Amino acid sequence: MADQLSNEQISEFKEAFSLFDKDGDGTITTKELGTVMRSLGQNPTEAELQDMINEVDQDGSGTIDFPEFLTLMARKMQDSDSEEEIKEAFRVFDKDGNGFISAAELRHIMTNLGEKLTDEEVDEMIREADVDGDGQINYEEFVKMMMSK
């Protein structure tokens, strides 16, 4: 399944993997998964985290390595983001609930994920998704961006 991914997708997923793999040891533990999920406003229990890891942990190590992560991402892309997941993600980004994701909200989320972005990088991300040019991302623009990934 992971062999259907392009090199660009693999390198994007490698970047995402490093965000999760806080200590850089090449595996994602339940603790690391929990940290990332909490920074995104989720509050999973230890058992839920273990279930998530067990779902993709093919070698029974109790952690997720990069090949397992790729398989998970390929699977996720196949049953493509359901509308509910996209709505949920939009709500996480849209901190003040006004129906738009501003540069400040985007920067806040990315910083929580451990991504230190310059103002230029954040503005560039907004510009890429901002179809109507109002300087922020509305729900329709967000859906388009998520579907084109």
Curated annotation (Swiss-Prot):
CDD domains cross-referenced by the UniProt entry? EFh
Pfam families reported for this sequence = EF-hand_7
User: Can you list the GO cellular component terms from the UniProt entry?
Assistant: axoneme; cilium; myosin II complex; paraflagellar rod
Binding residues annotated for Ca(2+) 3, in chain numbering: D94, D96, N98, E105
Q: Name one GO molecular function term.
A: calcium ion binding
Q: Which family does it belong to?
A: Belongs to the calmodulin family.
Q: Which additional comment does the entry carry?
A: This protein has four functional calcium-binding sites.
Q: What does this protein do?
A: Calmodulin mediates the control of a large number of enzymes, ion channels and other proteins by Ca(2+). Among the enzymes to be stimulated by the calmodulin-Ca(2+) complex are a number of protein kinases and phosphatases.
Q: What is this protein called?
A: Calmodulin
Q: Which organism is it from?
A: Trypanosoma brucei brucei
